[in-house]
């Protein structure tokens, strides 16, 4: 599924096998078929979906059955007996890890995140994995018992008896920064896309189970931003005054984080002090303007009856697009080596200057579903998710909506990274 090519793979314990020869074979085909047949390109809804890309999972389609011993549940490594508890290790990835971190934050437990690979007495630590050190939490009366209870729903955590690493950095060093428990402000109301706001709210309430303060955008002038560490601006058109924008700038400069989605990026586009621009160079902008003028001249001879069909060339109602990841950046932790974004709008920005372009569409990218020909040509070299650092804070730009309908699990994890991992 990742390369769209034939390849060898190793079947390992706890891998999932879905048979196509079963009573629900048609449903299995629908959920795993990446290339959906479209009877007509006129569509009001997404035109591609499949479980491997939605979950960011490594998956293979087989032409023959395989005969291996199977089981109905996932097996977890048993907890070893330990004499000393130095720390707890929690692998990062998926809803259970996000809920575990949320639970720890809500109970005032200090948590660290690995920034590099390391090997700790049989535990392979990956970037983004969580470490809870006993030394960081002297306020907990019974450290081992408290963390064990809080992680009751997380089956794959491990107990670490020593902070010395076989390879990579020792625990507690600069390679394991403390994560700040975010204080989240979410704006709603006039101008904010109600569906996209609802998707963020659902994520906070159900997926992460983490508190967020919801305030009507008309009251933004009365909000004391310093009471929060993170502001989420869901897709929409925010009618901020110049004073509101200045206050937002100061919030970021002093260490705050703003997560901006969809059309909300307009607040930062072409603004002094930020590097969010549609085009990387004046030449690129000139070429785009010239093509638009040429197309407008040519369209004078177009007939009215084919107008809707012609407009399709520059639209996308929902397709899967391959993205290259900067795997070293916290925004990409747990996502693997590539990310497939579910793109539902034609909005695009060329790769940004002076910004961490964490996920971007490469040249010759793979795609699934319908994309208009004109738009498809423009997508190469455009950024999907980026982080701009300003002063002590940051702005996370989300051109695509990773929370679309709440079912794109890789997107849910990416948003979790923006909320919890990007300090």
Predicted regions and their residues:
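Intrinsic-disorder/low-complexity accessory segments
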Residues: 1-423
